[in-house]
Swiss-Prot record:
Name this polypeptide is given: tRNA uridine(34) hydroxylase
EC number of the protein: 1.14.-.-
Catalysed reactions listed for this entry: uridine(34) in tRNA + AH2 + O2 = 5-hydroxyuridine(34) in tRNA + A + H2O
UniProt family annotation: Belongs to the TrhO family.
PROSITE patterns reported for this sequence: RHODANESE_3
Domain of life: Bacteria
Group of enzyme by EC: oxidoreductase
Pfam families xrefs: Rhodanese, Rhodanese_C, UPF0176_N
Role, per record: Catalyzes oxygen-dependent 5-hydroxyuridine (ho5U) modification at position 34 in tRNAs.
NCBIfam families: PRK00142.1-3, PRK00142.1-5
Gene3D superfamilies in UniProt: 3.30.70.100, Rhodanese-like domain (3.40.250.10)
BP term (GO), one: tRNA modification
Length: 328
């Protein structure tokens, strides 16, 4: 039986001098021990997800904790059967979380170490979910929400996190005087976003400490009131959260049946994320529209080595056709 792989999710807001140099040093160490993953390092802190066997991940955690700046860094640990990443990336960025404010090119003046929302543990957050007078706001991207979310949480009419501040400004009159609690995957986005909400004048702002990942592992709440699965930015794509009464909320793009399997549209110029069963992926050659299904650079066709005749037959079976110039 192969050894389990550990996936580490973590972040910390802390001042890092010479962050660009530290990023290079960090990458060198990660590669030297065979770690895989993706890490962002900025002047304001560090944010990463990495994976490896027990020995490798333990070496990494010990090395990180040996730096006094990260001595108390909180690693959230999952156990999996296979690697969550194929390569190792460490990138220097201006920020580990960018709010995309029009009046502020960078968000360095929003320092979570100085201004942030009240930390709520899983039990307190569950109580907030059950409180009719509390507004629960999902701060993630739309495709993350669609895979899974807390019951009753607001889904902002946005595509990505950078659009959220403007959405809040446009809708602040609806919940300015109410208690607002926010959540995200591991907590890093909420640290900064809840601080921004406080700066905007919201009087009572809370955040799920440790994010959804921590809520799902809490022995008392066990992920209850979470519907669906949690989206993660690695090869796993999704992980279960609700261990009490799990449900599937996402629906197959093609037939509307329950489905948690995310794929990217095979048209490289579209790349839209859609839910699709293996059967429907095959049937629709992973294209989200007739144009994408017949696109000359359809990746599903290329990956599966379909001949032009096989491709045309797939499309004919669903009432579509392949233009003469495509695949000729």
């Amino acid at each position: 039986m192969s050894e389990k792989i550990r996936v580490l999710l973590y972040y910390k807001y802390v001042s890092i001098e010479n962050a660009q140099e530290y990023a290079a040093k960090h990458l060198e160490f990660c590669k030297s021990i065979g770690l895989k993953g993706r890490i962002l390092i900025a002047d304001e802190g560090i944010n990463g997800t990495v994976s490896g066997d027990y020995e490798t991940t333990q070496k990494y955690m010990d090395w990180v904790h040996s730096d006094e700046r990260f001595a108390d860094l909180w690693f959230k640990i999952d156990e999996e059967n296979q690697q969550a990443f194929r390569k190792m990336f460490v990138r220097y960025k201006k920020e580990i979380v960018h709010l995309g404010l029009e009046d502020n090119n960078f968000d360095s003046d929003i320092n979570p170490l100085e201004t942030t929302g009240e930390y709520l543990n899983p039990k307190q957050f569950k109580e907030a979910l059950l409180d009719e007078d509390t507004v629960v706001l999902d701060t993630r991207n739309d495709y993350e929400y669609d895979l899974g979310h807390f019951r009753g949480a607001i889904r902002p009419d946005i595509r990505n996190f950078r659009e959220l501040p403007q959405w809040v400004r446009d809708n602040k009159d609806k919940f300015m005087e109410k208690r607002v609690v926010v959540y995200c995957t591991g907590g890093v986005r909420c640290e900064k976003f809840s601080g921004w909400m406080v700066r905007e004048g919201f009087k009572d702002v809370g955040q799920l400490h440790g994010g959804i990942a921590t809520y799902g592992k809490d022995p008392e709440v066990q992920g209850e009131l979470w519907d669906g699965a949690m989206y993660v930015f690695d090869d796993r794509i999704s992980v279960p959260i609700n261990h009490v009464n799990p449900t599937v909320v996402s629906k197959d793009y093609f037939d509307g049946t329950p489905c948690e399997r995310y794929v990217n549209c095979a048209n490289p110029f579209c790349n839209k994320q859609i839910f699709a069963s293996e059967e429907n992926e095959t049937k629709y050659v992973r294209g989200c529209s007739p144009e994408c299904r017949a696109h000359e650079r359809n990746r599903y066709v290329q990956e599966n080595g379909l001949s032009r005749q096989e491709w045309a037959e797939r499309l004919e079976a669903i009432g579509e056709s392949l233009p003469e110039f495509v695949g000729a």
